[in-house]
Amino acid sequence: MYQDLIRSELNEAAEVLNKFLSDDHNIAQIEAAAKMIADSFKQDGKVLSCGNGGSHCDAMHFAEELTGRYRDNRPGYAGIAISDPSHLSCVSNDFGYDFVFSRYVEAVGRKGDVLFGLSTSGNSGNILKAIEAAKAKGMKTVALTGKDGGKMAGLADVEIRVPHFGYADRIQEVHIKIIHIIIQLIEKEME
């Protein structure tokens, strides 16, 4: 009954991934992000990750696989998703939602750390403010974006952009693949 819809959805997902994969710049950016993060870990730095909605879940997934594990056992890496409900609700109430991530970066971020921000539109105000705060602290920044990069285009030290202009879930599907590859590369760099 729904087999054509299922095939159509899977084919569209494959097309978005293949378009991303066909641009060598994307591959180089993934490698650059992994090396940047591994270099931070080698200097006792950490990664702070953030996103909204499904991208927030991806930010938590990224941090969890850094502190826990990806495929194989190894020492944990310092990854923190900015996801504490009391922090998010306090800052949202007292300062506004645009400041939920930047306030955390200001409090916890240090020179040599990395901010890992996800925004499928590239226009999330709270991620933009987090990038600004990270740069002010001397941190490196990685942004996973979509579409044309939005307001984040060119702001991060490394931007990995999925150039899809349809629904955000297609961008998120590629983002999670990027996250897994970055973790795999970090593990190789840390051996």
Swiss-Prot record:
Cofactor(s) listed:
Zn(2+)
Recite the UniProt cofactor note for this protein.
Binds 1 zinc ion per subunit.
Please name the CDD domains in this protein's record.
SIS_GmhA
Q: Name one GO cellular component term.
A: cytoplasm
**Recorded catalytic activity of this chain's protein:** 2 D-sedoheptulose 7-phosphate = D-glycero-alpha-D-manno-heptose 7-phosphate + D-glycero-beta-D-manno-heptose 7-phosphate
NCBIfam families attached to this UniProt entry: gmhA, PRK00414.1
What role is this protein assigned? Catalyzes the isomerization of sedoheptulose 7-phosphate in D-glycero-D-manno-heptose 7-phosphate.
- This protein is called Phosphoheptose isomerase
